[in-house]
Amino acid sequence: MSIKYSNKINKIRTFALSLVFIGLFIAYLGVFFRENIIIMTTFMMVGFLAVIASTVVYFWIGMLSTKTVQIICPSCDKPTKMLGRVDACMHCNQPLTMDRNLEGKEFDEKYNKKSYKA
């Protein structure tokens, strides 16, 4: 079974989307505690904070996305954005690198760490 690669921007967007649903679910749980106003308010506030956190994450990844390098994927010929030295295509999940020293090597996320020396 091969490893499934995923684009970093898509991973962060998926995390932000999951924060929205988790926040709504937590806030909805507060409805079951209508008798105790403190618990109900706590659940609703925590859910609201999760939704606000997702907004912050979406804003952050949007700003980060404007600074990324756009390249054309050699496999699907579609434009994709790269974060770091290695990343995956947003459309076909093809492993990509712009570092000549890493061409032909096995795809690994550790190449993006500052402590890694090629």
UniProtKB/Swiss-Prot annotation:
Pfam family, one: DUF2614
GO cellular component, one term: plasma membrane
Disulfide bonds: none
Membrane-spanning parts: 12-32, 43-63
Keywords: Cell membrane, Membrane, Transmembrane, Transmembrane helix
Primary residence: membrane
Signal peptide as annotated in the record: none
Subcellular localization, as worded in the UniProt entry: Cell membrane
Membrane-protein topology: Multi-pass membrane protein
HAMAP family xrefs: UPF0295
Family as reported in the entry's similarity comment: Belongs to the UPF0295 family.
Protein's name according to its UniProt entry: UPF0295 protein BCE33L0445
Species this protein is from: Bacillus cereus (strain ZK / E33L)
Organism classification: Bacteria, Bacillati, Bacillota, Bacilli, Bacillales
